[in-house]
Amino acid sequence: MKKGTQRLSRLFAAMAIAGFASYSMAADTIKIALAGPVTGPVAQYGDMQRAGALMAIEQINKAGGVNGAQLEGVIYDDACDPKQAVAVANKVVNDGVKFVVGHVCSSSTQPATDIYEDEGVLMITPSATAPEITSRGYKLIFRTIGLDNMQGPVAGKFIAERYKDKTIAVLHDKQQYGEGIATEVKKTVEDAGIKVAVFEGLNAGDKDFNALISKLKKAGVQFVYFGGYHPEMGLLLRQAKQAGLDARFMGPEGVGNSEITAIAGDASEGMLATLPRAFEQDPKNKALIDAFKAKNQDPSGIFVLPAYSAVTVIAKGIEKAGEADPEKVAEALRANTFETPTGNLGFDEKGDLKNFDFTVYEWHKDATRTEVK
């Protein structure tokens, strides 16, 4: 994690002791809850979400706000824990907040959506990719990221085309996000007529995967796909290298975090990952990227600009609706497209983006990435 992100983590964690933190620029405000992990093993993804959302709030307010009102960001910590996410969602409702950017993890997002939909709160997640989140006919739930059933086939087709002669294992962390995307990858690979030699789950939070790695070695595995997050992937990479497992590793956007390099060290070199397009490299975003850098913040984090876009969409939706009524804003979101740093975004009836691309990148030990052509 870069120094700017580390400072953000400490700041947000300190604020979370009180339950939430508020960023306000005027008495007449529209509150937006920023719900995600301030603490816990994947707090780095919450840092990305908050950095992007708070930058959008700051810039919108400097430009005059929304329909004469200023935006206010209110931080809530769910630690990416489903039970804590339910408590956060109830607090958001009790605090009278009508808009949410979050949650971050799919497993914590889904139970929170039930509360938001019932209580008339509009939510946009910049990071939760499980298809089930938007599959229940809800009208107030949206996302500015693609789905596992978009991302999984991208990885599966890549594996089938480039590693069809290798012995393949597909692993997952037994959680909604990780197991869901691993299942999509397995299905895509097998639909191409290629056998998956090992399909197995591990326990998120475990630290020792040597028994599993020994099993992979005995099976002659040469390529490993892991559905899950960077803490487990980093340990898998490091322990596989130490055990002499000669295999290429690949994962979803949940592994694309600079912290994985701190965990895996040189073993992170060459890891493959499906990630959103590198929006920070788009020339049209140069002024925005410079604004992040002026704050010593890293705009390349995979959820930074999707979170910025989520706030942008809420603000423009309120302008289109003419008022900060979540139901009317939801109608405006489905009826329009919105120019954002992550493209011109339009939403379908489910609240999903009509278009979103995942790209295969190669990870490097200095925490940079290169698109695989």
Swiss-Prot record:
Pfam families from the UniProt entry: Peripla_BP_6
Record has Zinc as a keyword: no
GO annotation, biological process: branched-chain amino acid transport; D-alanine transmembrane transport; isoleucine transport; L-alanine transport; L-isoleucine import across plasma membrane; L-leucine transport; L-valine import across plasma membrane; valine transport
Signal peptide interval: 1-26
Subcellular location, principal: periplasm
Keywords, alphabetical: Amino-acid transport, Disulfide bond, Periplasm, Signal, Transport
GO cellular component, one term: outer membrane-bounded periplasmic space
Compartments (UniProt record): Periplasm
Positions of disulphide bridges: 80-105
UniProt key word Transport: yes
Stated family: Belongs to the leucine-binding protein family.
Role summary: Component of the high-affinity leucine, isoleucine, valine transport system I (LIV-I), which is operative without Na(+) and is specific for alanine and threonine, in addition to branched-chain amino acids. Binds L-leucine, L-isoleucine, L-valine, L-threonine and L-alanine with nanomolar affinities. Can also bind L-homoserine with high affinity.
Protein name from the UniProt record: Leucine-, isoleucine-, valine-, threonine-, and alanine-binding protein
Organism field: Pseudomonas aeruginosa (strain ATCC 15692 / DSM 22644 / CIP 104116 / JCM 14847 / LMG 12228 / 1C / PRS 101 / PAO1)
